């Protein structure tokens, strides 16, 4: 019984990481850029139909919806070798093609105008699935389309498909360099409100950390977008391997999410990946064992979220899921878990069990890989709140001076007042407070005292 997943790609960032993701999936399943299964790909052990469906003439088409308010990125996809992979009916470009101008309010209000056309596409995809499990949304939170239209769609998806899961891959802006989007803190904060209230699970892709990993670990001097996006597609494909090469555990999205998210609002996940190498020379001097991979995943330098050091709060893991790919002896897994617990290599919440789960997954038989074992960590860690605190600090600076609010005032949602902004600030603050509360033993009764 396949549990299908529909991917929604929004805006420049969403479509670029989505494009890399589909490239990666095609390579892993032995599907050519035109969607034809390659001659060598005859093993029937993978489940292609979670992410693809078959057209009448046997070729595979991604269950993807490509949305943008300006044509550039989608045109570049349509001029690539993968142009014929997608269903052309699933591509939506807005009529006037002016984009959202990096303005959340513009993306949001354009969403109100065009949502019927978009939901025609989404409903058609949903009707074409046997038992739809949910939606995966790829977007960035700092721009206009991914954040504004993304926020609008998150709200509507909840109304329209209340029982379906919504998972997002949300790209957070790079804090190490100056942004050319001056209203980025506003956009981010408004989107965070929706990610808190309308998504079941948010995988945080932090550009700050991804750039650092590319420079420090992969030794790329000035990483380009496409190199960063390859990192992202590695994470995205690894986090879905258990769905595509099903084992006896974690073979659907809810299984993945349930083990990581014990309380509904704390659903922002960080990821770590190892071994990260682009050159083959390193591969020959390193023996990768399960313990090795699991220990490395706990090292901060492999974690793809750059979190601040907070001396006051004793930050800790709420839950960890390691997806280990490759040749693994299951007894080794048990031993590794024991070692990690005995040596207290990870600091866990005081109010619940130290939950480290391990999902073993096969690797794609069609891709050569330099390493016997590779691993992805998906972790729910309270320190992710430092990202939100950073956004709030930047927002407060701008809001105090009422800087750049003119562009927002043009749209209906902000015509009379900026309540929506202040309300979002409040909700993100509650989220931060709850993450801090989760580091204390009395978290279970948190939120009941003040009612």
UniProtKB/Swiss-Prot annotation:
The lineage of its organism: Eukaryota, Metazoa, Chordata, Craniata, Vertebrata. PROSITE patterns: TUBULIN. GTP binds at residues 142-148. Pfam families: Tubulin, Tubulin_C. It comes from Xenopus laevis (African clawed frog). It is found in: Cytoplasm, Cytoskeleton, Microtubule organizing center, Centrosome; Cytoplasm, Cytoskeleton, Spindle. Keywords: Cytoplasm, Cytoskeleton, GTP-binding, Microtubule, Nucleotide-binding. Belongs to the tubulin family. It comes from the Eukaryota. This is Tubulin gamma-1 chain. InterPro entries: Gamma_tubulin (IPR002454), Tub_FtsZ_C (IPR008280), Tubulin (IPR000217), Tubulin/FtsZ-like_C (IPR037103), Tubulin/FtsZ_2-layer-sand-dom (IPR018316), Tubulin/FtsZ_GTPase_sf (IPR036525), Tubulin_C (IPR023123), Tubulin_CS (IPR017975). GO terms for molecular function: GTP binding; microtubule nucleator activity; tubulin binding. GO terms for cellular component: centrosome; cytoplasm; gamma-tubulin complex; gamma-tubulin ring complex; mitotic spindle microtubule; nucleus; polar microtubule; spindle. Tubulin is the major constituent of microtubules. The gamma chain is found at microtubule organizing centers (MTOC) such as the spindle poles or the centrosome, suggesting that it is involved in the minus-end nucleation of microtubule assembly. The keyword Nucleotide-binding applies. Gene3D superfamilies: Helix hairpin bin (1.10.287.600), Tubulin/FtsZ, C-terminal domain (3.30.1330.20), Tubulin/FtsZ, GTPase domain (3.40.50.1440).
């Amino acid at each position: 019984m396949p549990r299908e997943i529909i991917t929604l790609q929004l805006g420049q960032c969403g479509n670029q990481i989505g494009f890399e993701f589909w490239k990666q999936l095609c390579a892993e399943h032995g599907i050519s850029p035109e969607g034809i299964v390659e001659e060598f790909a005859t093993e029937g052990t993978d489940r292609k139909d979670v992410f693809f469906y078959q057209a009448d003439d046997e070729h595979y088409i991604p269950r993807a919806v490509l949305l943008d308010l300006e044509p550039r990125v989608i045109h570049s996809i349509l001029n690539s070798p993968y142009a014929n992979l997608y269903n052309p009916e699933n591509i939506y470009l807005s009529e006037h093609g002016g984009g959202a101008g990096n303005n959340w309010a513009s993306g949001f209000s354009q969403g109100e105008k065009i949502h019927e056309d978009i939901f025609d596409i989404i409903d058609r995809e949903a009707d074409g699935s046997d038992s739809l499990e949910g939606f995966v949304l790829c977007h960035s939170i700092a721009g206009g389309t991914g954040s504004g239209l993304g926020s609008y769609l998150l709200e509507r998806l909840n109304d329209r498909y209340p029982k379906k899961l919504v998972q997002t891959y949300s790209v957070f802006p790079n804090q190490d360099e100056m942004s050319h989007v001056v209203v980025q803190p506003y956009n981010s904060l408004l989107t965070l409100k929706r990610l808190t209230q309308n998504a079941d699970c948010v995988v945080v892709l932090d550009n700050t950390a991804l750039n650092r990993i590319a420079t420090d670990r992969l030794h790329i001097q000035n990483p380009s977008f496409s190199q960063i996006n390859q990192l992202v597609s590695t994470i995205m494909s690894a986090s879905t391997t258990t769905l595509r090469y099903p084992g006896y555990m974690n073979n659907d999205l809810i299984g993945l999410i349930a083990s990581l998210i014990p309380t509904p609002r704390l659903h922002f996940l960080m990821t770590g990946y190892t071994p990260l190498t682009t050159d083959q020379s390193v591969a020959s001097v390193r023996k990768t064992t399960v313990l090795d991979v699991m220990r490395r995943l706990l090292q901060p330098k492999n974690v793809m979220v750059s979190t601040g050091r907070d001396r006051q709060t004793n930050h800790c893991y709420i839950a960890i899921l390691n997806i280990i790919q490759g040749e693994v002896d299951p007894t080794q897994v048990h031993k590794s878990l024991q070692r990690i617990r005995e040596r207290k290599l990870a600091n866990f919440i005081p109010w619940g069990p130290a939950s480290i789960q391990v999902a073993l997954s096969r690797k794609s038989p069609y891709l050569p890989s330099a390493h016997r074992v590779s691993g992805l960590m998906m972790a729910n860690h309270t320190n992710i709140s430092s990202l939100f605190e950073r956004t709030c600090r930047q927002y407060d600076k701008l809001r105090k001076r009422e800087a750049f609010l003119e562009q927002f005032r043009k749209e209906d949602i902000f015509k009379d007042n900026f309540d929506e902004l202040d309300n979002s600030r409040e909700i993100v603050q509650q989220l931060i407070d709850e993450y801090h509360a989760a580091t204390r033993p009395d978290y279970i009764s948190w939120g009941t005292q003040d009612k």
